[in-house]
């Protein structure tokens, strides 16, 4: 098994919800017969964690912990000479003839198209094959969506990357031949800080164009404490990025 895939499986099961919560619940059940008090404590802790992580109050707070990025405006473009849109995921959609971009990728493409129209900058889409054997690449799916739904054509396709670090290094290789060292980077808010760090490492200065900027948590309202699957998914994404940021700091 590929070590990168194995690492992702371990992280998903042991560190990220809902996998980590399921593991904790199973552990609580297993030990409750021999150590009832400890087992109940684990079960209650996992249940409370599941509720909290399923609220927008917690998912929004976690997202804000990943960085501090304002909405993009054309005046912020500075020395940028290109727009880089990062892939996220893909879906099997028979109504679209097979593979197509997933919801997160589509959100990034939508903002990337808006930035392109506001600035006139050319677009690079970055994303390899989601799984071995997939065809086409995510970059090719993004190109198709930009053409069909936004009437835009990316100038460059980076089709080999498998993670954010490779998004950065391989995009930099392409843009270096065009003497471009500053880009507008389009990705989700909670993914932005780590992405910008990796792009800087690769030699590209990035101007942030974040998608899905967290809402304000004050004043407190019912919608922020009502559990929802979407909030749990957002908590998972934010925790994934916080772990990634911590790993980057440990590397240096």
Predicted features by range, described:
Residues 1-31:
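Membrane-embedded alpha-helical segments of integral membrane proteins
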